[in-house]
């Protein structure tokens, strides 16, 4: 923990094409080795694929997908009297978004399609339709929290 007080939250600039901070955060999550231009190109091509397939605005589809991925509850390990309990806690809004974006990118990378553009587009489309690996991850997280509901009184 810093001695000089809380660290200031850095604000991201909205991306030039969609003027959205959410898109910028997704680009930053996708970026590998500081290659932001490459990540940007991949995302924009994915959005083009989504627009082509659905006929809807890619941004709306992406926002719906993210809404379907973001978890409401998660479990945190809490040590009580020599035993570790998985305590269900509510996820803060900022962390919800971060987890949603992280899961979206991670599960898109694990898909079998040939290019990253296709993988990301398909994962976003699946998530928008409430299917896909990222949505399954959210469901598993919620199931875990539900299963450990008995330890909710250990919340801090």
UniProtKB/Swiss-Prot annotation:
One GO biological process term: translation
UniProt keywords, alphabetically: Ribonucleoprotein, Ribosomal protein, RNA-binding, rRNA-binding, tRNA-binding
InterPro entries per the UniProt record, alphabetical: Ribosomal_uS7 (IPR000235), Ribosomal_uS7_bac/org-type (IPR005717), Ribosomal_uS7_CS (IPR020606), Ribosomal_uS7_dom (IPR023798), Ribosomal_uS7_dom_sf (IPR036823)
Signal peptide boundaries: none
UniProt GO MF annotations: rRNA binding; structural constituent of ribosome; tRNA binding
Pfam families, A to Z: Ribosomal_S7
SUPFAM superfamilies, alphabetized: Ribosomal protein S7 (SSF47973)
Disulphide bridges, residue numbers: none
CDD domains, per the entry: uS7_Bacteria (cd14869)
Gene Ontology CC annotations of this record: small ribosomal subunit
Protein family per UniProt: Belongs to the universal ribosomal protein uS7 family.
Function noted in UniProt: One of the primary rRNA binding proteins, it binds directly to 16S rRNA where it nucleates assembly of the head domain of the 30S subunit. Is located at the subunit interface close to the decoding center, probably blocks exit of the E-site tRNA.
Quaternary state and interactors: Part of the 30S ribosomal subunit. Contacts proteins S9 and S11.
Protein's recorded name: Small ribosomal subunit protein uS7
Species this protein is from: Bacillus licheniformis (strain ATCC 14580 / DSM 13 / JCM 2505 / CCUG 7422 / NBRC 12200 / NCIMB 9375 / NCTC 10341 / NRRL NRS-1264 / Gibson 46)
């Amino acid at each position: 923990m810093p001695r000089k007080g809380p660290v200031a939250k850095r604000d991201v600039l909205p991306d030039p094409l969609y003027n959205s901070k959410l898109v910028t955060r997704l680009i930053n999550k996708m970026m590998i080795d500081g290659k932001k231009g490459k990540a940007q190109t991949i995302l924009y091509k994915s959005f083009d694929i989504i627009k082509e397939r659905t006929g809807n605005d890619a941004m709306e589809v992406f926002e719906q997908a993210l809404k379907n991925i973001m978890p409401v509850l998660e479990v945190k390990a809490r040590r009580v009297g020599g035993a570790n309990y998985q305590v269900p806690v509510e996820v803060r809004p900022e962390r919800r978004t971060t987890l949603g974006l992280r899961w979206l990118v991670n599960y898109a990378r694990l898909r079998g399609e040939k290019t990253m553009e296709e993988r990301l587009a398909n994962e976003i489309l699946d998530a928008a339709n409430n299917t896909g690996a990222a949505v399954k991850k959210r469901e598993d997280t919620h199931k875990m929290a539900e299963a450990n509901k008995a330890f909710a009184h250990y919340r801090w």
